[in-house]
């Protein structure tokens, strides 16, 4: 598919041909859901598990006689009521790192890019700014109509001047092409790709 390319200030800068194998895939909600769930699960941390009765090193021998002492009956120092005993119904370690087939991950990213190609994709020639100031960049965004949440993806690395200028703009995030992912693409209203980013993403799937 052919898409118009513009400069960061909104002026026309020609056209670019997008690979239909990457930007023309029909999105499927079930695939996108699986990939997003996998991403969010991988971001979760897990608390250190507590030690229950079977985990503590305490004697299991009865340490006092059953009757006659005037105290309660006990038979195990690992019981939760004793200092150093195991926790009753304590937190257990949970695995938040599920596996997901690489082909499914790749397909999910293609579908996310394709969904934005239908609505919300902008291609710019580069992120070079004559004046790398937040105020100037906001003016460019307003002129181009990039409202709401905007995700900007550059090539091998992010343009430093643009990154600094965009750092104070709420709802604007910048990533290198290698950092492109389904969750971030879908949660933003507008996806801005540089021509370098398009080349990197297409090479990522076709290489």
UniProtKB/Swiss-Prot annotation:
What is said about its interaction partners and assembly? Answer: Part of the 50S ribosomal subunit.
According to UniProt, the name of this protein is Large ribosomal subunit protein uL4
Q: Which Gene3D superfamilies match?
A: 3.40.1370.10
Give one GO biological process term: translation
Q: Which UniProt keywords apply?
A: Ribonucleoprotein, Ribosomal protein, RNA-binding, rRNA-binding
Return the HAMAP family for the record: Ribosomal_uL4_B (MF_01328_B)
To which protein family does this belong?
Belongs to the universal ribosomal protein uL4 family.
Q: Name one GO molecular function term.
A: structural constituent of ribosome
| Biological role stated in the UniProt entry | One of the primary rRNA binding proteins, this protein initially binds near the 5'-end of the 23S rRNA. It is important during the early stages of 50S assembly. It makes multiple contacts with different domains of the 23S rRNA in the assembled 50S subunit and ribosome.
């Amino acid at each position: 598919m052919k898409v118009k390319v513009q400069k960061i200030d909104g002026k026309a800068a020609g056209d670019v041909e997008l690979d239909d194998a990457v930007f023309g895939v029909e999105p499927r909600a079930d695939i996108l859901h699986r990939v997003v769930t996998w991403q969010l699960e991988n971001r979760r941390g897990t608390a250190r598990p507590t030690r229950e009765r079977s985990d503590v090193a305490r004697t299991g021998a009865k340490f006092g006689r059953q009757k006659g002492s005037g105290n309660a009956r006990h038979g195990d120092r690992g019981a939760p009521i004793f200092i150093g005993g195991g926790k009753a119904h304590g937190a257990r370690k949970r695995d938040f790192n599920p596996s997901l087939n690489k082909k499914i991950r790749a397909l999910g990213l293609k579908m996310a890019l394709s969904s934005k190609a239908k609505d919300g994709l902008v291609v710019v020639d580069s992120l070079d700014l004559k004046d790398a100031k937040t105020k100037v960049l906001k003016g460019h965004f307003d002129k181009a109509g990039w409202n709401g949440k905007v995700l900007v993806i550059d090539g091998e690395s992010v343009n430093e001047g643009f990154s600094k200028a965009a750092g104070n703009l709420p709802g604007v995030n910048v990533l290198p092409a290698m950092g492109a992912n389904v969750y971030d693409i879908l949660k933003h209203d507008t996806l801005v790709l540089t021509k370098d980013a398009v080349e990197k993403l297409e090479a990522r799937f076709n290489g």
